[in-house]
């Protein structure tokens, strides 16, 4: 998958898809918004936010 800009609900949906039952921590403090909304990020980067 190509890198994508993911913001707001799109970012949360992508995390649900990537993390599944593991769940994830969504906090602006983790830098995920800078990494995936302001800049394009990969699914591999999203996996860093799974529990």
Swiss-Prot record:
GO biological process assignments: glucose metabolic process
Pfam families hit by this protein: Insulin (PF00049)
One GO MF term attached to the UniProt entry: hormone activity
Protein name: Insulin
Superkingdom of this protein's organism: Eukaryota
Family, as annotated: Belongs to the insulin family.
Oligomeric form and interacting partners: Heterodimer of a B chain and an A chain linked by two disulfide bonds.
Gene Ontology cellular-component terms listed: extracellular space
Annotated keywords: Carbohydrate metabolism, Disulfide bond, Glucose metabolism, Hormone, Secreted
Cysteines engaged in disulfide bonds, as pairs: 7-37, 19-50, 36-41
Matches recorded under SUPFAM superfamilies: Insulin-like
Intracellular or extracellular location(s): Secreted
Primary role: Insulin decreases blood glucose concentration. It increases cell permeability to monosaccharides, amino acids and fatty acids. It accelerates glycolysis, the pentose phosphate cycle, and glycogen synthesis in liver.
PROSITE patterns: INSULIN
């Amino acid at each position: 998958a190509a890198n994508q800009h993911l913001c707001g609900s799109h970012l949360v949906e992508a995390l649900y898809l990537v993390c599944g039952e593991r769940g994830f921590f969504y906090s602006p403090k983790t830098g995920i918004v800078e990494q995936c909304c302001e800049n394009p990020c990969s699914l591999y980067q999203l996996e860093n936010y799974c529990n």
